[in-house]
Amino acid sequence: MTNAATDKSVASVARDVSTGKPGKSPDAAVHLLSGGLAGLTSAVTLQPFDLLKTRLQQQHSETSKLTIAGEIRKLSQLKELWRGAVPSALRTSVGAGLYFTTLSKMRAAVAQYNHRDSSVTSVLPKLLPMENLATGFVARAIVGYITMPITMVKTRFESNIYSYRTMGESIVGIYKDIGPDGVVHRSSLLNFFKGSVATLARDCPYAGLYVLFYEGFKNDVLVKVIPESVTGSDSRSSVINSSSAILAASVSTTITAPFDAIKTRLQLTKETSILKTTGILLREDGGVFNLFRGLSLRFGRKALSAGISWCIYEELIKSDFSQCRLFNKERLA
């Protein structure tokens, strides 16, 4: 969304949830901070899901029995489940803040161009299905590439192939392309973008499909399912947003699961080809099911993360937080 003090016309994109009347569009800083807080909360809370998923995906199924319980038993301390929480929190909070800001601006621009208002349960503009798909796809592509170096650090940290003790050590190790055997290969900044194509092939369709399903469930399905007796209450809005997020994440996660398995294997090995990596996964014991390895963990993590993140984000945007003096430039003028 654009600044209300400099662009009055975009204010029509947002509605007051209690009255249904056009309201003030939140400042971009509000979207950035709200998205960041939402992402940070979900990242720290759900880090064990990410770590276990990475551990499962890094292994060759013919040499190890792949079970979640087996991976947990390998941990010497419970706190190891949160290994990689710092880069994960950094990536998710920064990524979520940038993503929500970019997405809100793109959606506001499209809605303004088409002269559409926001939905009753959301301050976000209501778009057509293909517009939801396109804006989510493009926003994730931009933010995903920007945060790719943090994603690389996060994946290496979560893996037990590399015994990094600090983020600084992992950054040096990735830059110098130091393998698990300690051998230095090719030093390059491009090492931080290894697996970026597979990552974007996973995240962009996921984001586009997610926004498509999220808006569909929220505006066309759950609005009709949630009892009218709580219409207009804050609880109804929260339930609709969280339920829509969980359902959308579940469907989108299943569709894009193969790219997640390929991405993780690329970032933890010397292989650079998506096609070769896919072939290796298919030839291992388990065949095509290897492309869905760790799906249950990603499924649970994405669903819970979406429910937490989007609920916190939308409720912060609609709350008095977005009208506080810090973000209201008209009051400061």
Curated annotation (Swiss-Prot):
Subcellular localization: Mitochondrion inner membrane
Gene Ontology, cellular component aspect: mitochondrial inner membrane
Catalysed conversion reaction: glycine(in) = glycine(out)
Alphabetical UniProt keywords: Membrane, Mitochondrion, Mitochondrion inner membrane, Repeat, Transmembrane, Transmembrane helix, Transport
GO biological process, alphabetically ordered: glycine import into mitochondrion
Extent of the Solcar repeats: 26-109, 127-220, 236-319
Region of interest called Disordered, as start-end residue ranges on this chain: 1-25
Transmembrane segments: 32-57, 84-110, 133-158, 195-218, 240-266, 294-312
Family (UniProt): Belongs to the mitochondrial carrier (TC 2.A.29) family. SLC25A38 subfamily.
Function description: Mitochondrial glycine transporter that imports glycine into the mitochondrial matrix. Plays an important role in providing glycine for the first enzymatic step in heme biosynthesis, the condensation of glycine with succinyl-CoA to produce 5-aminolevulinate (ALA) in the mitochondrial matrix.
PANTHER family in the record: MITOCHONDRIAL GLYCINE TRANSPORTER (PTHR46181:SF3)
Protein name: Mitochondrial glycine transporter
